[in-house]
């Protein structure tokens, strides 16, 4: 019988740890964890996402600051705000909501955030720390960090002897996910759109992570019996059964058929998704502990 991972439940337990750690830090050192979120322009999806991040930060007991800037904000103005937040000791995490409206260039903005405040884990310094196995001072990108919580809950801390395949090589997810698996001693293969015999490569995986943005691409015959399958894809597909023009969310894995083969699987929605915001909160409270010279909590 397959185990379907309840992402909402595990995210809630992460948030519980964040709340306890936030309160303990305040009690021991008088430091209130601070998160600043910057949003530029009026994209409704971005505003909804930022709203949920800010609400969650307040729920965790953080000082939560939201900077809403007009679409015509210049590169210099945005860079200036980041510099101000970098210099503010009451802010431990800085998040710039992407994508930025054109013609703003997000890359120099992201790289200008102090690595110790880069709670999205997107700076080249944090990417480099992960690549060299430094998980003590770096911050890890939230979605792979969340997916890794699932892997550890199923397989433990040490993945020695297990084969892991990550489909997707993005800087945002695929590469950091592979590094995390490698740091835990898994034997890791990164597959992608140019990989030959992709199904065959996937069939060797004890842990299969799909992050390519192709609806239900991973079929049952790609999966080793009993494997752990982590589905990071979020795809909208037509759902005529719901009515004309309606859509539904599916992952990169054909959930129903793969559930017959896998040992453990994450659903879409309700799997990796809820973990992303939870791990953002985790990174922020970790950053606050480090800034205060305290030992950060483990997730």
From Swiss-Prot:
Keywords assigned by UniProt, alphabetized: Amino-acid biosynthesis, Histidine biosynthesis, Hydrolase, Methionine biosynthesis, Multifunctional enzyme, NADP, One-carbon metabolism, Oxidoreductase, Plasmid, Purine biosynthesis
InterPro entries noted in UniProt: Aminoacid_DH-like_N_sf, NAD(P)-bd_dom_sf, THF_DH/CycHdrlase, THF_DH/CycHdrlase_cat_dom, THF_DH/CycHdrlase_CS, THF_DH/CycHdrlase_NAD-bd_dom
Residue pairs linked by disulfide bridges in the UniProt entry: none
Any one GO molecular function term: methenyltetrahydrofolate cyclohydrolase activity
CDD domains found in the cross-reference section: NAD_bind_m-THF_DH_Cyclohyd
EC number(s) reported in the record: 1.5.1.5, 3.5.4.9
Pfam families: THF_DHG_CYH, THF_DHG_CYH_C
Binding residues annotated for NADP(+), in chain numbering: 168-170, 193, 234
GO cellular component: cytosol
UniProt-listed GO biological process terms: L-histidine biosynthetic process; methionine biosynthetic process; purine nucleotide biosynthetic process; tetrahydrofolate interconversion
Biochemical pathway: One-carbon metabolism; tetrahydrofolate interconversion
Claim: NADP is one of the keywords in the record: yes
Catalytic activities: (6R)-5,10-methylene-5,6,7,8-tetrahydrofolate + NADP(+) = (6R)-5,10-methenyltetrahydrofolate + NADPH; (6R)-5,10-methenyltetrahydrofolate + H2O = (6R)-10-formyltetrahydrofolate + H(+)
Function comment: Catalyzes the oxidation of 5,10-methylenetetrahydrofolate to 5,10-methenyltetrahydrofolate and then the hydrolysis of 5,10-methenyltetrahydrofolate to 10-formyltetrahydrofolate.
Quaternary state and interactors: Homodimer.
Family of the protein in this entry: Belongs to the tetrahydrofolate dehydrogenase/cyclohydrolase family.
HAMAP family reported for this sequence: THF_DHG_CYH (MF_01576)
PANTHER family membership: C-1-TETRAHYDROFOLATE SYNTHASE, CYTOPLASMIC (PTHR48099:SF5), C-1-TETRAHYDROFOLATE SYNTHASE, CYTOPLASMIC-RELATED (PTHR48099)
Annotated protein name in UniProt: Bifunctional protein FolD 2
Organism the protein comes from: Rhizobium etli (strain ATCC 51251 / DSM 11541 / JCM 21823 / NBRC 15573 / CFN 42)
